């Protein structure tokens, strides 16, 4: 890959991760369920429930690890967006991009893709995408994004 010398992937709890150099990009799909019934599978519950990684702890670590020009991107349920953005703001990070994802055109967005940076002010870029058309087919956007992953 042309990125082999430039990309590092770490599979570890962010609470235990330390790196003095900092990162230009941090991507997360953090646990987000709060005060809800937990799955009996403890690994699955830890991956989904925010008590294993509260938003405050995530942003504390992101703020420490992100370079001054870096971008933090996250996938968040739409109902958690306000709290997530507020927590980012407490740690000096502002939303620069938001993309709301609808499963179909008739349904409300279920997920939001958020990008944060340290740069203050400016207007947030906001878009919306649909995964599946009303006829059940993948949307043009989703097909273009994922077509290389399908077996032909």
Language-model regions: role of each:
Residues 1-24:
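S-adenosyl-L-methionine
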Residues 1, 87-91, 119:
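Alpha-helical structural signal in soluble globular domains
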Residues 16-17, 32-34, 79-82:
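Short, catalytically relevant binding-site loops at active-site mouths
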Residues 27:
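A conserved beta-strand element that flanks and buttresses the S-adenosyl-L-methionine
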Residues 106-152:
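SAM/dcSAM-binding transferase cores
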Residues 52-109, 113-114:
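Conserved Class I SAM-dependent methyltransferase catalytic core
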Residues 21, 30-57, 61:
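Mobile active-site "lid"/loop adjacent to the S-adenosyl-L-methionine
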């Amino acid at each position: 890959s042309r990125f082999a010398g430039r990309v590092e992937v770490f599979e570890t709890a962010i609470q235990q991760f330390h790196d003095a150099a900092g990162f230009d990009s941090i991507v997360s799909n953090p646990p987000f369920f709060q005060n809800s019934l937990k799955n009996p599978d403890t690994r699955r519950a830890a991956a989904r429930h925010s008590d294993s990684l509260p938003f405050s702890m995530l942003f504390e670590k992101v703020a420490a690890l992100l370079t001054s020009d870096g971008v933090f991107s996250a996938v968040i349920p739409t109902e958690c967006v306000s709290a997530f953005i507020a927590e980012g703001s407490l740690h000096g990070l502002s939303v620069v991009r938001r993309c709301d994802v609808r499963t179909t055109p008739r349904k409300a967005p279920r997920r939001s893709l958020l990008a944060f940076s340290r740069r203050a002010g400016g207007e947030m870029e906001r878009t919306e995408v649909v995964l599946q058309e009303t006829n059940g087919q993948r949307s043009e956007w989703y097909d273009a994004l994922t077509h290389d992953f399908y077996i032909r």
